[in-house]
Regions:
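Conserved G1/Walker A P-loop phosphate-binding module
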Residues: 1-76, 80, 84-87
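G-domain G4 guanine-recognition motif of GTPases
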Residues: 65, 95-99, 115-132, 146-155, ...
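Conserved hydrophobic helix-helix packing surfaces used for dimerization/oligomerization
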Residues: 12, 187, 293-295
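C-terminal effector/interaction modules appended to NTPase cores
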Residues: 2, 17-23, 200-393
Length: 393
């Protein structure tokens, strides 16, 4: 379980004031000295993550955040980073001290984003009036806090139980291939080994898709683009589904048997991580782009650009081939994502294998709130190749 990608783990974030004991609580929850602890306020200057497992829930990711009461120029920057963590959060642990206006504001902020919140009153070992404070927090925040001591582990099991109770009903139910495949289906995977393919290994979407197909007891054949015809000829019957790299969508479409359905890894991840229906609807905004338009391309991972880079080279080339060279394209990566999306006519996101579903959906909602179309690499490439209505998802 330690090898479960962070993107597939339940994201549990701790929020609270500086020196409220968030870092000590992370250490208590993990049973390790994961985070530096100090009585000096503001020790945590950046979000810190720690992968762990909570039985019987499974793999989780704890996120320790800077205090939301930080001050000064640097303090404001730290608070901004804490705010960005909200978009990734599946369950929030909010450390309260009195239930005052600031803590109520953060509770409301989290609830408005649809995030289940567990209130905690930490440092029970050092407070003479713990019971009275807990009643005060319950009265002001509308729910009782769990009384906790990170020092002697009081309340840790209660936190585990509360996390299980607050687990989103649909968490972990989303699958990569959905209802597209069934036991015994023959599936062909087309995986070009170009400059973008890491030497000696497969990229994460391919690995996860193969694992899921094995779990579903499908029969898998894989090949590079130039060996697709040979692969198809080796089969007694056409495959039920062909999953390809989006970059060779058109090539594979021209060679596939009429009986075989076609999709791509990126398109599958559009539904696995995001909102496939909004992505498909938004892809038609490509037809409305002009040289005066502005497009944002967002990558989840950070890497040195390559000559055949799909996000930085191939998609911009396809777009400008259609609209003209004047089309303005901005590219961001990792957690960098503009707070103000209003200048953009279209957003094109990668498959987001490195992000959890909650984070991708929060970006989609940010765009949708401004009525800005947002699609992903695979869906956009399918539309640009004129085959969006001929693929499955």
């Amino acid at each position: 379980m330690n090898q479960t990608p962070n993107a597939n783990r339940l994201h549990i974030a701790l929020f609270g004031r500086r020196n409220s004991g968030k870092s000590s609580l992370v250490n208590a929850l993990t049973g390790q000295d994961t985070v530096i602890v100090s009585p000096t306020p503001g020790t945590t200057t950046d979000p810190v993550t720690k992968a762990m497992e909570i039985h019987p829930l499974g793999p989780c990711l704890l996120i320790d955040t800077p205090g939301f009461d930080d001050e000064g120029e640097l303090g404001e920057m730290r608070v901004e980073r804490t705010l960005k963590i909200i978009g990734k959060t599946d369950i929030a642990l909010l450390l309260c001290e009195t239930g005052d206006a600031q803590e109520q504001e953060w509770l409301q902020r989290l609830k408005e984003r649809g995030i289940p919140v567990i209130l905690l009153l930490n440092k029970a070992d050092a407070r003479p009036n713990t019971t009275e404070l807990a009643e005060q927090i319950k009265a002001s925040c509308g729910q009782p806090p769990i009384i906790v001591s990170a020092k002697d582990s009081t309340g840790i099991e209660a936190i585990h139980r509360a996390i299980l109770e607050k687990l989103p009903a649909d968490f972990g139910e989303q699958t990569i291939t959905g209802s597209l495949v069934a036991e015994g289906d023959v599936i062909v995977l087309v995986m070009p080994q170009d400059l973008q393919a890491p030497k000696g290994r497969l990229i994460l979407p391919q690995v996860q898709t193969i694992r899921e197909l094995l779990d579903k007891k499908c029969l898998i054949m894989s090949c590079t683009t130039d060996k697709l015809k040979d692969t198809l000829h080796a089969l007694a019957n056409p495959p039920k589904l062909i999953i390809t790299d989006s970059q060779v969508f058109h090539t594979v479409y021209e060679q596939k048997p009429a009986e075989s359905r076609l999709t791509s890894f990126s398109v599958l991840f559009a539904g696995y991580k995001g909102d496939i229906h909004y992505y498909v609807e938004s892809a038609f905004a490509i037809d409305r782009l002009t040289e005066q338009s502005r497009v944002l391309i967002a990558e989840a991972c950070t890497h040195a650009p390559l000559t055949e880079d799909i996000g930085r080279v191939k998609i911009p080339h396809l777009l400008r081939k259609r609209t003209g060279e004047g089309l303005q394209i901005d590219i961001v990566s990792g957690n960098d994502f503009p707070e103000d999306l209003s200048p953009y006519n279209l957003i094109i996101h990668c498959g987001a294998c490195m992000f959890n579903r909650k984070y991708v959906l929060s970006r989609i909602e940010q765009a949708r709130a401004l009525q800005i179309p947002m699609t992903n690499y695979g869906v956009a490439i399918a539309h640009l190749n004129g085959i969006l209505n001929k693929i499955v998802y």
